[in-house]
Amino acid sequence: MAEEVKFSPYEDAVAGLVVQILGRTGVAGEVTQVKIKVLEGRDKGRVLTRNVKGPVRLGDIVMLRETEREARRITAR
């Protein structure tokens, strides 16, 4: 009865490649909205729009805990 032990909540994370930077969002512009191409897993090849906190640039690899949710588009008020 060997159970698989998870040491980190991020073990199920999926790698994604930043392919386009769409803009900044958040009250102080601390979040960057980017398009990410999923590199592995069941959604391999899918392009998602996600919000990323912290420094990010084209070509960066981002680890996604889940690949089902997408961020809403940035709209001008």
Curated annotation (Swiss-Prot):
Pfam families: Ribosomal_S28e. SUPFAM superfamilies: Nucleic acid-binding proteins. GO terms for molecular function: structural constituent of ribosome. Keywords: Ribonucleoprotein, Ribosomal protein. Gene3D superfamilies: Nucleic acid-binding proteins. It comes from the Archaea. HAMAP family: Ribosomal_eS28 (MF_00292). NCBIfam families: PRK04007.1 (NF003080). This is Small ribosomal subunit protein eS28. It comes from Pyrobaculum neutrophilum (strain DSM 2338 / JCM 9278 / NBRC 100436 / V24Sta) (Thermoproteus neutrophilus). The gene is rps28e.
